[in-house]
Structure formats: C-alpha cells, structure tokens
Amino acid sequence: MHMQLLRNDGVVIFDRTDFGKSNLSLPNGKCRNDLSEGALKVDCSAHSVEYDVSSNKFRALMVQTNVWCFSGAITPDGKLVQTGGFNDGERWQEIPNGLAARKWYATNHILPDGRLIIVGGRRQFNYEFNPKNIAANTFNLPFLLETNDKGEENNLYPFVFLNVDGNLFIFANNRAILLDYMKNKVVKTYPTIPGGDPRSYPSTGSAVLLPLKNLKMADLQAEVLVCGGAPKGSFAQASQGNFTKALKTCARITITDPNPKWVMETMPLARVMGDMILLPNGKVLLINGAGSGSAGWELGRNPVLSPVLYRPDRKIGSRFKTQIPTTIPRMYHSSATLLRDGRVLVGGSNPHAFYNFTSVLFPTELSLEAFSPTYLDSKFNDLRPKIITPKSMSGIRYNKRTNIQVVITGKVAENLVSATMLAPAFNTHSFFMNQRLLVLGNDKVTTCGNSAYNIEVTTPSTHNFAPPGFYLLFVVHQNIPSQGIWVKLR
C-alpha cells in the first residue's frame, strides 16, 4: 500500500493493520494488542517490512497504529515521518500533538524551511504543519471543499508540488490553485482540465512535477503533467458493476506561466490507478493500474500490464513509448519506487477488504518485482558513468560549484553529460509525495585520463528549487544514468 526508499537503500513497505493475520510473524514473540481493531485484537503478524535491496532480504517491522491510507515524507535529517491513518492511526500517538486534525487520504510535502505541510484528507478541507512553530491549528482551504464531488469525493490525496517561487501548486479533482501557504492566500487559479473529468482519488490518476532545468535562469519554468484517471461517475458506476473505461489522456501545464493553459496528450493505453515515476535521465515511467473502473474495493478491471515511457522533451505525438509488459496485475493498493541502481521496484496489489489469495478475480499479491528501464541494457555499459567521487552521504551546499569525478569507458559526448538530483518520494495510491528531479547540467567537463572525467556542476541556488535533505545524485551520459549516490543538501 505504501512504499518509501531510505538513504540506507532499504525500502519500507507498509500495509493496514486491520486486514487480519499476514503471512509474516513478528520476531521474538511480539504481538500487537489493540482492542479497537476489527479483525484481530491480538495480532502477532507483521504489517510492515524493511526490504534490503542489495541482499534481497527483509525484516519485519512493528507498527503501533493503523497506517491504512496515511501519508508520509522523509525529513531533512533522513527520518521517515508518517502522518494520519485510519481509526487509532488517525491520532498521532508516537509524537504527541503532532497533528491538529485527523488525517486520512492526505498529502505531505517538504517545505523550503524543512517542515512538513499536510494537505487535505477525508472531510478535512484544510492544511497544517509538522512540526509546529505556531499555534497547533489547521488552516482552512475552501478549494478542497469546492472540489469535493458529492458521493464520490474525487479530491483525496491531492497532487501537491512546491513551485519554484516558494508557493504550493495544489491539484484536486480536475483543477488546481497556487497557494501562498504562509498567508493562507490563493495567488493563482488555474483553468479546469479540458473535458472536466476528475483525476484524484477515487478517480485516481497520477501526476509529476516535470524535471526542473536551467536552474540558473532568472525565469525558471516549472511544468506539471497529470495522466490518467476515470470519468466522472465511474466510482458510482463501478459500485453497481458497470466498469467505465479509464481516461486515456494526459494534461500538461506550465505552472509558472502568467497565462497558463493545459495542453492535452493521448496515452497509448487508458489507465486508472497508474503510478508516475521520474527516472534519473528525466523521463517519466507510467506503470501499474487498471484499464477500467476506479480505485476502491473490487472496483478495478482490465489490468494494464504494459508500462509506458513518457519523454517530455520530444514533440507532441512522439512522447510515449510502450514498454515490455509484466505478467502480474498491479491493481488497487499496489506501489512502486525508484531504486538507487535505476531499477523500479514494484509490489503489492490488494483490492479486497481483507487478505484474499484464492477464488477471486485479482488475488492479494505479495510479490515484489523490478522493472528495468532500457537504459540498464548491457549494450549501454560503455556509455554508463560510474561515480568515483564524491562518496555517498557527502554533504553539499546551496549555490556552490561541485566536482563529480566519473569513469566512462566509451566515447564521451561532453555536451550530453549532465548531473541530476532526485528526492526520494513516498508512494501511495498512485501518487509520489515530494517527488522532484533537478537537472544540474554541467558547467565544465575535463578529461583526467584513463577514462576518468571531472564534471563541474552548480548546486541549486535556493530552497524553493530543492528543499533541504537527502537526494540521489546521478550522472547521465547520452540518456544513460550512473548508479546514484546519496548526498545531503543543506
């Protein structure tokens, strides 16, 4: 249901605690005692694991409260903070008074000052901060009430991105605003996506802030891409056994434009509950989901097995490329995350109210698999950079010249060498919270001999471009990325 890559290359995977007994026991005879649970009052099975990618092993984690449909983010010091959840999980127990309101289906984002903002949630038309340096209250956001469709909602898990001017782009249902969250003021209202169909849960599409480039320009542009979803009324129709075909369109908008307009594109495959993942070379991967129905228990049909690559720098009509399909349906409550080696880890799928492994259309799926983008093909090994320095976990500062030394064994095209920085995202319900890719480019490439090269780059100049914290740093040569290393921007 939820997935987060950590700076130790572990992946934390969460599931709700009230499904009943899982297939993994807690260690050392531990059990969770909770009289509020509907399935098991005493549960000795695990509902969360940490997966070690390098060793292909996992360990059970014990969660104290129900993390069903909660939200999360990595703080600047590298800690995973989870907010909200269901039942007892709605109340922050581990950090007293961490939330002023119960949050379920909310969205988190790291702010330029390192705090978390928590936006929306079921019946929560507001936002709040964590930690709190002012009164422990919420701030009303009427936009979330205005985008709430009666009987369907269609505005849960809103798509939230930090704009380059420091304001928040917030998309819910079929439209968006730009919010000055410090003044609680809407500074821009964006047009409705043409057609007016919803893109937010349960008509679940996905969205990304496209890679930020040309970071030294005074008028840096930022673009958002929203893809997939379900036509209005799909949730109600699916609840009655009528599974409407998912949306086949994407909408792209320059959110920094003084007169922004959505530009529509058509995907090769209709998709609801799909995930959109930024790859280190600046491409976008669309993966998982269904071809009809909506999000929710038993409401999706026609699994979309083929991932699709979106190439944002190409002309309209040539941006999408269908990839090799999987054989495993990844429906409601599936998840994914980019790994440091450039693969995409995909796991889960459970459209049932409990664990159900047999005699159903889409059984509960516990497997993990890795999707390998074409840039990992061995035929590109001579083009693939290998980072020598800096070492992993190095600290870097804002607006500083930084040297990266790499080895590239093949012929080097210096104008096609670039460094990128990717913020690790918290994935749930087809959205990657805090996902962000910055293209640092290269200021200068110097040959050092023996296939070694020094690449000089300039780090982001402001916290508005890149909030402080841990990032994966890649070097990309002719669209072929190196393995990433962890760096801490401060």
Annotate each language-model stretch with its function:
Residues 1-4, 9, 37, 46, ...:
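Beta-propeller and closely related beta-sheet repeat lectin domains
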Residues 149-294:
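Beta-propeller domains
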Residues 37, 43-55, 90-93, 124-138, ...:
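Beta-propeller blade signature
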Residues 378-417, 486-490:
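Beta-strand/beta-sandwich contexts
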Residues 193-203, 260-275, 303-306, 313-339, ...:
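Conserved blade-ending motifs and adjacent loop-strand segments that build the rim/top face
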Residues 10-26, 30, 38, 46-50, ...:
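Immunoglobulin-like IPT/TIG beta-sandwich domains and homologous Ig-like subdomains
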Residues 40, 61-67, 95-103, 144-153, ...:
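Short loop/turn motifs that recur once per blade in beta-propeller domains
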Residues 90-155:
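Asp-box/WD-like beta-propeller blade repeats and closely related beta-sheet repeat scaffolds
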